[in-house]
Amino acid sequence: MVPAPFFCNRIRIHTSSVKSQEEGLCVNAKKKQISPIPHVKVKAWFVKKAITCYQLLHALVREKHICVHLVSLDSWRNLANAFANEKSLFLLDLAHQRSLAQTLVHSASGLINSEASNQYVRGLMGHMATYLGELSSKNDLKSVAQQPDIILLVSCVLERLRGVASASEPRTQKAIYELGFSVMNPILVLLEVYKHESAVVYLLLKFVVAWVNGQISYLEAHETAIVVDFCMRLLQLYSSHNIGKISVSLSSSLLSEAKTEKYKDLRALLQLLSSLCSKDMVDFSSDSIETQGTNISQVVYFGLHIVTPLISLDLLKYPKLCHDYFALLSHLLEVYPETVAQLNSEAFAHVLGTLDFGLHHQDAEIIDMCLRSLKALASYHYKETASGKTGLGLHAAGHKDSGGNLQEGILSRFLRSLLQLLLFEDYSPDLVGSAADALFPLILCEQGLYQRLGNELIERQANPTLRSRLVNALQSLISANQLSSTLDRINYQRFRKNLHNFLIEVRGFLRTM
């Protein structure tokens, strides 16, 4: 087995390290009166060796039987001790801080039992959690925190914490939860202090996202309540300082730079809300969060009010942000439709505007998530109103704008838009199933509009034969295969078949009208 110092010496792939080694080679070459190795080749050789060693180090902990041997080596223990206690390893760049922390925590799977693994993690990160706690409690923190070396050190510690959090697994979950719990208050203090340091804010958010994502499924009810409360406080603090908002008074170049910078924060917040939502989908705890009166939907509701105004259609042009946003939106509407329905009119209209944008996106996955969102929205309203409740309430009703013109309700608008898409626009055939699932509850909610839209299509068809085919097809769409008005699995399947047959029958000649 290759000893740890071999890796420890070679994972430092900073330019300064490479430069000093290549200069040494060139000097030795001159002394021996031989041609020095070309500068570019020397640098490439050292970087390649360093990257190879770095990748090998990370790969060693993928198999448990290798980890069992690793943790028994003095050299591995020396590496772990150096990571926990020596300042020299803070010379590594941020990505390597995170990766090395993740690698060392993964190696804990080779220890004899869960208690030993948890103690190993505590030994690795205890000093760093203590450091953040002591730093955050300093009386002169505001001035000390702005020193470049302190900013760098805080950034390194945050990345190490993120690496540990991302390595969470059942065996080490307890220690990693305790680690995150111990730095909750320091994290909030640092967010306050570094509110104008966008790079530090981003690192801080990414740690919280990784920690919540790795922990949420395993937390008991009282622990979940603590985490949800922490996330609420984090969101409130983020919102109170207007972090993430972009001034429209900026020049075009600065505005573009600000958008690029802030979209990272928004992605992190979206991921945080998604992780919290997952508790209701995947939960390995022994008790229900309801026993503690924890309402995740409340923090999600608050988070939506913070995030949605910041997400413009321009920002949705960033593919990763766009994907995360619609993934969260579809998940929220499927799990907490009542929370979205409670949004104020401005926030709700903004959400619907982004949905309309997503329906006409080039990425089929984005369109699919929007269709799932529409299905959840329409089915929620239909079931609620069928039981005598308000459902989406005023959001679903038509209204007059400031000019006195009647504006359609949101379900009417999307029924019209979805039929237009299915009959006249280009899309992937793979989306027909998801489109059917969204169209079915929309038709049930707006049966009068469906009839009017059908009549409009019929009146525009001059050919008697084609008109007859269209009449029959429109009727079959909502009645064939014993389709009923119950939103259950069998009826969704029946409607999928009906829509497939409907499109085969009429889409061809309708597009030539």
Predicted feature residues:
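Short, flexible/disordered intra-domain loops and linkers
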Residues: 384-390
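Alpha-solenoid ARM/HEAT helical repeat scaffolds used for protein-protein interactions
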Residues: 63-68, 112-116, 170-172, 215-219, ...
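Extended, C-terminal alpha-helical/coiled-coil scaffolding tails that mediate protein-protein interactions
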Residues: 407-513
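Compositionally biased, intrinsically disordered low-complexity regions enriched for acidic
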Residues: 280-294
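Short amphipathic alpha-helices and their capping/turn residues within compact interaction modules
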Residues: 240, 330, 334-338, 360, ...
